[in-house]
């Protein structure tokens, strides 16, 4: 209805009816907005008719106003009802599109991989804890007395030489036991913590001492200057080699499975007497099942007991130690020590958690 046109009740009624019909057929909010602009916007027939009422004779304005009010109400009611319906349908479609099918297989995120060395350390600690033993964690910078003297190493023993041991320059100490003037070293064995345990914890004593140790070895396929040991010490009345052998057999089974077993070969260590090399029966050995060297062990030397203030006529004890890296190499058929220390993530990925 053009500007200045006369009010045409039939034309505006027909236009509104047409708009309501289109509203009923609309299926999207975009369609509804376009219909509203066309039939109720500023240029629509309904708006133009409302403007034309002002030009009508006074006796016709009232009826024209009522008609326009009814038409606007009808249009608005139809639009509002359809708008709610379309919005509900669109929301339902969006929800359906976002629905997660719980039966579908998921794309699993890669699992993290821990380095196998600390994991094996935890396994060993769990073994001893399961037997009621205590875990002892001593200092890595140690007095020479604890690392050598208390373990029956003579003053001229080759292990004391600077080509075998890292000495901490310019340091002497008075340790907790009151020994003055002892040089400081990076501990060469966790046996030093066994002596600490004897002095500070008393007897009966059953401790395992895992940790890092340091020796002046070159890094190659089988050696590294920083490595890990787990040494164990039991001191009580009436302990024998049979008790030692029983613990070693249990440890072998825990680390390598039910087919694992151990044997002892005579050897010499300053801090044990008698001493033995510890061999492991290894069914998966290349070239066929056989024995492999695993560690060292023996009954605690009476001089070590005396250094801790114990009477060797009353107390006996046994001790043994195994290399954690050595255990790991055997357990997982790793051929080169470099793999353990170079931090290549591809190596750790072989030991993904949960697998």
Curated annotation (Swiss-Prot):
Signal peptide: none annotated. It is an enzyme of class 6 (ligase). Its EC number is 6.1.1.20. Its cofactor is Mg(2+). Tetramer of two alpha and two beta subunits. NCBIfam families: pheS (TIGR00468). This is Phenylalanine--tRNA ligase alpha subunit. It comes from Bifidobacterium adolescentis (strain ATCC 15703 / DSM 20083 / NCTC 11814 / E194a).
């Amino acid at each position: 209805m053009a500007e200045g046109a006369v009010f045409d009740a039939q034309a505006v009624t027909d236009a509104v009816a047409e708009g309501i019909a289109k509203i009923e057929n609309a299926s999207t909010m975009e369609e509804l907005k376009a219909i509203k602009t066309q039939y109720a916007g500023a240029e629509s027939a309904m708006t133009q008719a409302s403007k034309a009422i002002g030009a009508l004779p006074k006796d016709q304005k009232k009826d024209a106003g009522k008609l326009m009010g009814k038409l606007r109400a009808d249009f608005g009611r139809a639009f509002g009802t359809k708008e709610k319906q379309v919005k509900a349908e669109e929301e339902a479609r969006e929800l359906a599109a976002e629905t997660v099918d719980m039966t579908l297989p998921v794309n699993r995120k890669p699992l993290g991989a821990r380095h196998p060395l600390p994991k094996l350390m935890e396994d060993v600690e769990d073994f001893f804890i399961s037997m009621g033993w205590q875990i002892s964690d001593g200092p890595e910078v140690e007095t020479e007395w604890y690392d050598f003297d208390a373990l029956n190493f003579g003053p001229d023993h080759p292990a004391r030489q600077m080509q075998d041991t890292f000495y901490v320059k310019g340091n002497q100490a008075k340790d907790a036991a009151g020994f003055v003037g002892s040089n400081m070293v990076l501990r060469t064995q966790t046996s030093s913590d066994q002596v600490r345990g004897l002095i500070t914890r008393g007897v009966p004593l059953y401790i395992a001492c895992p940790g890092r140790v340091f020796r002046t070895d070159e890094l190659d396929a089988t050696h590294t200057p920083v490595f890990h040991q787990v040494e164990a010490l039991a001191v009580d009345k009436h302990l024998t080699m049979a008790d030692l052998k029983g613990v070693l057999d249990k440890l072998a089974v825990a680390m390598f499975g039910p087919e694992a077993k151990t044997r002892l070969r005579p050897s010499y260590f300053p801090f044990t007497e008698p001493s033995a090399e510890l061999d492991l029966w290894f069914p998966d050995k290349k070239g066929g099942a056989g024995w492999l060297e695993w560690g060292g062990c023996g009954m605690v030397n009476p001089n070590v007991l005396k250094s801790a203030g114990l009477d060797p006529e009353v107390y006996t004890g046994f001790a043994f130690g195994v290399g954690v890296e050595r255990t790991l190499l055997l357990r997982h058929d790793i051929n080169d020590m470099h793999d353990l220390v170079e931090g290549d993530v591809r190596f750790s990925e072989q030991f993904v958690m949960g697998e």
